Amino acid sequence: MNYLTLAIGTAIILLFSWYFSIREGRYHGIARFFSFESIFILVLLNWRLWFKDPFSGFQIISWVLLIASIYPGIAGYLTLHKKGKPEDNHIERTTVIVKSGIYKYIRHPLYCSLLLLGTGVMFKDPGKLQLVCGAVNLLAIYFTARLEEKEMIKKFGPGYIQYMYETKMFIPYIF
């Protein structure tokens, strides 16, 4: 692993986390930092094997997860941007609870996307360190979602609590 690349990437992720969440008191950005960081480390560990042995079981699982990560990420972002009435065009500053599109089924499509992405990158070469990074990503995403839900309850009150009862976190009808 190239440690200079790791240091530069980590600095960028820290700045992103600070600018878009933490500085405004949205502390779910701290947990989300660990998700971004674990995915970044997984990419650094596995990039050389991205296309090696493309028909192995792990590669097939990896590509299915990577491709599956695209839809919830794009659909979630576009729906938040269009329906969330964000202040200053910033999706973390939505002014209404979005309950349409993919948000009709899951509350956290962007985090679902990160979950699928991180797991897909991990499956490129699922060694011990990669499994640890994959577990960190899973835990970080779960805690990010829980922290964000507390923030949304403060912001939107009982309406968000009702929305939580109507939808699942990451997987429609399951979890």
Write out the residue ranges for each language-model feature.
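Active-site-proximal inter-transmembrane loops
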Residues: H90-L110
